[in-house]
Design a protein with these regions (language model features):
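Formylglycine-dependent sulfatase
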Residues: 1-207
Length: 207
């Protein structure tokens, strides 16, 4: 999904995070999201709290990319707000047209680390890398590509340690292209997973 798509999973849908949370687990999503944010495609105000985010899907905490590393906006979202938001440099995002005066990989290859971006990955330039989509602003909130893993992974142990103090934990970690579910595999967890699978079967009535 593009970085400006509304949240694909709707708040009224029953999620795996809902299932674990109802069983007393603390839940968190860390890393790549790629399933949309906000309640209107192209209508997100990245300078304010998003009206629809992972807190509406059963997650107690989230620290995520709005989409993926190759798409704008190139910022992390923490609990529905841009992390390290810089009010002196407001964020604007578009997947239809560029902003006046902003360089792109297609028109300004001399500004890139890689002088030959692929078609589609030749739009706004952030950190010397051209992306899918157009954006301007961001300031201190923009991630550093070489530090993405180091920026995300510290939240994993802190989330787990905080959760263990109160209950078990479900944490979804997506550093790039993979998803890892982290929790103790006990009989109760196995039962929860089977219950969730049943809610997703074609003959299921949902909650």
């Amino acid at each position: 999904a593009a970085g400006d798509v509304k949240m694909i999973i709707r708040p009224e849908q029953y999620t795996m995070a809902d299932m674990f949370k109802s069983a007393g687990y603390a839940t968190a999503a860390i890393g790549k999201w790629h399933l949309g944010l906000g309640d209107k495609t192209g209508g997100q105000d990245w300078n304010a709290p998003l009206p629809a985010a992972l807190g509406d899907l059963g997650f107690d905490y989230h620290y995520i990319m709005a989409a993926t590393a190759d798409r704008v906006p190139c910022v992390f979202i923490e609990n529905g707000k841009v992390a390290n938001y810089d009010p002196s440099d407001p964020i604007e995002v578009s997947y239809t047209k560029n902003f006046p005066g902003e360089p792109t990989g297609k028109d300004n290859p001399e500004l890139l680390y890689n002088l030959h971006p692929s078609n589609g990955h030749d739009m706004s330039i952030v950190n010397g890398i051209s992306r899918i989509g157009f954006m301007k602003g961001g300031g201190k909130a923009l991630w550093k590509d070489e530090n993405i893993a180091d920026s995300i992974t510290p939240f994993m142990p802190s989330t787990l340690s905080n959760s263990i103090k109160t209950s078990l934990s479900l944490c979804i970690l997506q550093p790039m292209m993979y998803t890892f579910l982290v929790f103790p595999m006990t009989a109760s967890v196995e039962r929860i997973l089977w219950d969730y699978a049943e809610t997703q079967s074609p003959n299921s009535t949902g909650r």
